[in-house]
Design a protein with these regions (language model features):
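A structural signal for short hydrophobic beta-strand segments in well-ordered beta-sheet cores
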Residues: 18-21
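Flexible loop/turn segments at secondary-structure boundaries
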Residues: 9-12, 38-39, 70-71, 99, ...
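A short core secondary-structure module
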Residues: 27-73
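Short, solvent-exposed loop/turn segments at the edges of secondary structure
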Residues: 13-15, 42-44, 56-57, 85-90, ...
Length: 177
């Protein structure tokens, strides 16, 4: 699960308050903080967690396994859609993470986070375009079957215009992806 968003950080993801402190023996990081709206948080055994180290300007990224302990979850969020995934708040309370689980370099986490978000946006655009194609196809089929005043509604200019607009916008969306 991807653990970036925090209360009070919203769009300014780099301002998160979750902290990672190196243990005295230098063998592990202790992560403390709260993440919210974590997709698949209830199912995940592994978390990508973004946290600040000391007074660093940028986030660092860590691979955190649920088995490390110090992790607790709030109940499921009640959502209007996307019911197939678990969305929860995740709390890290002195979660001990081995030093080798620092992902990439220190302060490179924000760059990693943004790259993950950008990939997600591209995938979402593809899914939305697929939905648009299905709606166009279904609309054309319906317009050809639905009769009004003795002929299919697809023969009327207003319906043709609407179907043409749908097809044009869907093609434009696909071309932009």
């Amino acid at each position: 699960a991807y653990c970036l968003t925090e209360p009070d950080s919203g769009s300014d993801a780099n301002s998160g308050k979750t902290r990672a402190v190196l243990s005295e023996d230098g063998k592990f990081w202790k992560i403390t903080g709260q993440k919210m709206w974590i997709t698949n948080g209830g199912f995940a055994d592994v978390f990508t967690v973004f946290a600040k180290i000391d007074d660093d300007k940028n986030l660092s990224a860590f691979i955190v396994e649920k088995s490390f302990g110090g992790i607790s979850l709030n109940p499921e969020e009640h959502k209007m859609g996307i019911k197939g995934s678990s969305t929860r708040q995740v709390f890290f309370n002195d979660c001990k993470v081995p030093v080798e689980n620092l992902l990439s370099e220190r302060q490179n986490g924000f760059k990693i986070a943004v790259n993950i978000l950008n990939l997600g946006r591209i995938k979402l655009a593809g899914a939305a375009n697929g939905g648009s194609k299905m709606v166009c196809s279904t609309s054309v089929k319906y317009a050809n079957e639905r009769q009004q005043f003795g002929r299919p509604i697809s023969k009327y200019g207003a319906i043709r215009y609407k179907l043409g607009e749908m097809a044009t916008r869907t093609f434009a969306c696909e071309s932009a992806i």
